[in-house]
Design a protein with these regions (language model features):
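A short acidic, often aromatic-flanked loop/helix-cap motif at beta-alpha or helix-coil junctions
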Residues: 59-65, 107-112
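Glycine-rich loops and low-complexity Gly/Arg-rich segments
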Residues: 27-31, 78-81, 101-104, 126
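Gly/Ser/Thr-rich loops at beta-strand to alpha-helix junctions
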Residues: 6-14, 82-85, 108-111
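Conserved strand-to-helix beginnings and helix N-cap segments that scaffold or border functional pockets
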Residues: 14-18, 88, 114-115
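Ser/Thr/Gly-rich flexible loops in soluble cytosolic domains mediating phosphotransfer, phosphorylation
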Residues: 93-126
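Hydrophobic, Leu/Ile/Phe/Ala-enriched alpha-helical segments that form helix-helix packing faces
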Residues: 20, 24, 28, 90, ...
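Mid-chain, well-packed structural core segment of small domains
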Residues: 66-102
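Conserved active-site segments centered on acidic
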Residues: 2-64
Length: 126
């Protein structure tokens, strides 16, 4: 399962994904910057239960998704709370894909609560 976690530049979302990784007990989780992940996506998906890609919200559009073949694997996009204003425009840009877009809870993101974030991500997948 591939999930994209994004913020303005990717720095904070990267730290957040690393907190999710630390909080995981049973899940095999892999964390990687979205551009780097494109080079070995198939291996990461095969070897892990959850692949968390992180980066900037601004780069996500149809062309980017297709370039890396993410349309076949991306299960969800999670926007940092400060990027919530992009949700509607992102939905329009990605309307040809069936990728749900969620907003990360402000308290969860602010506290860098990896345990709660992992629970939220997994619950949204059910």
């Amino acid at each position: 399962m591939l999930v994209y976690v994004c913020c303005a530049t990717g720095n904070t979302s990267g730290m957040f994904c690393k907190q999710i990784l630390k909080a995981s007990c049973r899940e095999q989780i892999y964390v990687e910057e979205i551009h780097e992940l494109g080079n070995h996506l198939e291996d990461a998906l095969r070897e892990n239960d959850l692949v968390l890609a992180y980066g900037s919200a601004e780069i996500i559009d149809e062309k980017f998704i297709r370039r890396y073949h993410f349309e076949y694997h991306m299960q969800a996009i999670w926007l940092a709370p400060q990027m919530r204003y992009l949700k509607d425009s992102m939905k329009k840009k990605l309307n040809c894909f069936d990728i749900p877009i969620h907003i990360i809870d402000m308290k969860t993101f602010g506290k860098m609560d990896g345990k709660q974030a992992l629970q939220d991500i997994l619950n949204a997948m059910i």
